[in-house]
């Protein structure tokens, strides 16, 4: 697990250090900076190992917000998948109080935030977690007064301790999110989703289903494969295709993709490319939707090769099948277990959003 999490750091650290260089050749730059990345990764890992001990490395991911503060002695972890917030420190309770307030009032703008530095995330007048967490009195946490009072309550009434393997003592609080926290986050992005859906002719429920599966509507999302933001757009693959479609050179930067409007537009643009270019020959709309979902995860080429190595023959075979057959093959025969499960998850999520519309 630790090795996997370290791999997740590599592309993110690289992307952060080059976020202003749109149009950069990703492959050449990545190879060129490998030594520097090893140093950065080693430093981060060393800090966490030294302070927290073995098997304690937590880093930001697709559905997890993780932020270290106080020279890495305090950290906040928001699990957008499980709907739980854990804030813990090895320092005094004032540090814990401060971390609780800053976490509850952090904004939705990930563009200028370095999740791998140890500074506080700025307090926002429009907290991203607003409506997803309530305090001990059932109030929404909308400002610093409410957040501070709730932090005091948590420390006085809900404080827990645990012992690390290195002998250090950690004090922490755990805060559950409300039951429908996923839907609350989804609603924040509905105007942008509807705009992109209308512009590119893509079903809103499909966009919502993909976004939930990719990031659980976490605007800070980052993956080990360098997929960024709400729709987990990979700059040097899907991002490059989208820029080419728009007549732009190069690829989107990390900063560009951490803007929710840009990210949703890029993700839906890529769905349009899959629908109208790479998978254009598939005639049944349901079969095409299944192929698009699978291709969003594994690529159109990988999807077509499940049916035949020749693209035209693969499309012909798909067109001879019922949609249910296409679905069964993509969820059982596709060589990637991730892709097989991805179609199952997105299809289920899309159906849920169709019902709720």
UniProtKB/Swiss-Prot annotation:
A lipid is attached at residue 16 (S-diacylglycerol cysteine). Residues 1-15 form the signal peptide. It is found in: Cell outer membrane. Its EC number is 4.2.2.n1. One of its GO terms (biological process) is cell wall organization. GO terms for cellular component: cell outer membrane. Its main location: membrane. It is an enzyme of class 4 (lyase). Keywords: Cell outer membrane, Cell wall biogenesis/degradation, Lipoprotein, Lyase, Membrane, Palmitate, Signal. InterPro entries: Lysozyme-like_dom_sf, Murein_transglycosylaseC, Murein_transglycosylaseC_N, Transglyc_AS, Transglycosylase_SLT_dom_1. It is a lipid-anchor. Murein-degrading enzyme. May play a role in recycling of muropeptides during cell elongation and/or cell division. HAMAP family: MltC. This is Membrane-bound lytic murein transglycosylase C. It comes from Haemophilus influenzae (strain ATCC 51907 / DSM 11121 / KW20 / Rd). The lineage of its organism: Bacteria, Pseudomonadati, Pseudomonadota, Gammaproteobacteria, Pasteurellales.
């Amino acid at each position: 697990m630790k090795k996997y999490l370290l791999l997740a750091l590599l592309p993110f650290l690289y992307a952060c250090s080059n976020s202003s260089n749109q149009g950069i050749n990703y492959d050449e730059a990545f190879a060129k900076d490998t030594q520097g990345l090893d140093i950065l990764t080693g430093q981060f890992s060393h800090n966490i190992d030294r302070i927290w001990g073995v098997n304690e490395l937590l880093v930001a991911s697709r559905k997890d917000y993780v932020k270290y503060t106080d020279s890495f002695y305090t950290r906040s972890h928001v699990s957008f998948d499980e709907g739980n917030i854990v804030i813990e420190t090895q320092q005094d309770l004032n540090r814990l109080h401060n971390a609780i307030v800053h976490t509850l009032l952090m904004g939705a703008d990930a563009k200028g935030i370095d999740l791998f530095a140890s500074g506080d995330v700025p307090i926002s007048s429009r907290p991203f977690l607003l409506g997803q967490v309530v305090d001990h009195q059932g109030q929404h946490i909308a400002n610093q007064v409410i957040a501070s009072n709730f932090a005091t309550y948590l420390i006085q009434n809900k404080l827990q301790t645990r012992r690390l393997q290195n002998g250090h003592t950690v004090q922490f609080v755990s805060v559950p999110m409300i039951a429908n926290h996923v839907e609350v986050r989804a609603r924040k992005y509905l105007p942008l989703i509807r705009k992109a859906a209308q512009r590119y002719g893509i079903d809103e429920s499909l966009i919502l289903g993909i976004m939930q599966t990719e990031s659980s509507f976490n605007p800070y999302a980052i993956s080990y494969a360098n997929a960024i933001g709400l729709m987990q757009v990979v700059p040097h693959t899907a991002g490059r295709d989208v820029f080419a479609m728009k007549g732009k050179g190069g690829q989107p930067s990390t900063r560009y993709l951490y803007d929710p409007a840009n990210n949703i537009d890029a993700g839906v643009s890529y769905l349009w490319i899959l629908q109208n270019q790479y998978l254009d020959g598939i005639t049944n709309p349901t079969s095409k939707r299944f192929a698009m979902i699978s291709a969003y995860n594994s690529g159109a080429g990988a999807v077509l090769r499940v049916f035949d190595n020749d693209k035209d023959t693969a499309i012909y075979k798909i067109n001879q099948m019922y949609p249910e057959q296409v679905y069964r093959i993509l969820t059982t025969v596709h060589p990637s277990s991730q892709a097989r499960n991805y179609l199952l998850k997105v299809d289920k999520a899309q159906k849920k959003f169709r019902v709720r519309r």
